[in-house]
């Protein structure tokens, strides 16, 4: 281990996600965080493209079923009760009354299947993510914030229209491999996380990094961080635990702006620190 990594605070320095005794408690927690994440992305303007945009979260109990925001429901008013549970094979809604965006779900379900370590998958149509994706190139480590994605994201450069076939979703999942993000050419960004909060942080950060890169390109280019330094910085900042912790201020700020949703927060285990709420 390098001295720089050895000097990093250990995992015990940071907060950790809560642990639940029952599936029901865990599910209620995930659905609440799911709704808060959608409200967060609404504030960023990531829900302005009609029917596009999906966050899926694996159900903690029922294999190959995933909680999703329903088709055509505004992110800005979503609540846990609005979320639907969708079967990964049939794409039928098994809990709730609404339908899911099939094209997006075909991507998400195949990623979940290929990556059982992933709790959440996020794909939203953002301005900067779509613009940068059109170049079909990886994001350079231009800044410290981009380093968590250095050697930890991929590009899918075969845009063929809506992903209406499961095979197309499988190809995207295969290209993603074990990474935390993938840029879909002419389409946008996808991030994944071992926790929903980490996936939400990676998505927020990745879109910001795309914005920075586009600004730098427009100004005539910029010098990226050397590979060995970018790799080290990515190891320092790119863990899913750091991603989870980095998202907590955004979660708390979203609750402060949405008291109606904050009032729906489920009870947490007694040992859970306040920051994990």
UniProtKB/Swiss-Prot annotation:
It comes from the Bacteria. PANTHER family: ADDUCIN (PTHR10672), PROTEIN HU-LI TAI SHAO (PTHR10672:SF3). This is 4-hydroxy-3-prenylphenylpyruvate oxygenase/4-hydroxy-3-prenylbenzoate synthase. It is an enzyme of class 1 (oxidoreductase). Keywords: Antibiotic biosynthesis, Iron, Metal-binding, Oxidoreductase. Pfam families: Aldolase_II (PF00596). One of its GO terms (biological process) is antibiotic biosynthetic process. Involved in the biosynthesis of ring A of the aminocoumarin antibiotic clorobiocin. Catalyzes two consecutive oxidative decarboxylations of 3-dimethylallyl-4-hydroxyphenylpyruvate (3DMA-4HPP) to yield 3-dimethylallyl-4-hydroxybenzoate (3DMA-4HB) via the 3-dimethylallyl-4-hydroxymandelic acid (3DMA-4HMA) intermediate. Belongs to the aldolase class II family. Disruption phenotype: Cells lacking this gene are unable to produce clorobiocin. One of its GO terms (cellular component) is cytoskeleton. Homotetramer.
């Amino acid at each position: 281990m390098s001295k720089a990594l050895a000097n990093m605070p250990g995992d015990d320095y940071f907060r950790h996600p809560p642990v639940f005794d029952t599936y029901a408690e865990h599910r209620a927690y995930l659905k609440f965080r799911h709704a808060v994440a959608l409200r967060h992305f609404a504030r960023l303007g990531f829900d302005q493209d009609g029917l596009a945009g999906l966050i899926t979260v694996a159900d903690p109990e029922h294999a190959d079923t995933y909680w999703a925001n329903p088709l055509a429901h505004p992110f800005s008013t979503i609540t846990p009760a609005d979320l639907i549970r969708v079967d990964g094979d049939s794409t039928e809604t098994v809990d709730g009354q609404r339908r899911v965006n099939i094209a997006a779900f075909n991507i998400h379900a195949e990623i979940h299947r290929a990556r059982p370590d992933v709790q959440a998958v996020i794909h939203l149509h953002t301005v900067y993510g779509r613009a940068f994706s059109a170049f079909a190139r990886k994001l350079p480590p231009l800044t410290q914030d981009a380093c968590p994605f250095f050697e930890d994201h991929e590009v899918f450069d075969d845009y063929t229209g809506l992903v209406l076939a499961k095979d197309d979703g499988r190809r995207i999942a295969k290209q993603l491999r074990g990474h935390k993000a993938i840029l879909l050419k002419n389409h946008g960004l996808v991030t994944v996380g071992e926790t929903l909060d980490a996936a939400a942080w990676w998505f927020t950060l990745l879109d910001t990094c795309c914005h920075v890169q586009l600004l730098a390109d427009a100004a005539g280019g910029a010098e990226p961080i050397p590979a060995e330094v970018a790799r080290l910085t990515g190891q320092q900042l790119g863990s899913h635990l750091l991603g989870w912790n980095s998202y907590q201020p955004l979660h708390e700020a979203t609750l402060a702006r949405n008291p109606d949703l904050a009032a729906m927060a489920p009870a947490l285990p007694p040992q859970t620190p306040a920051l994990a709420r």
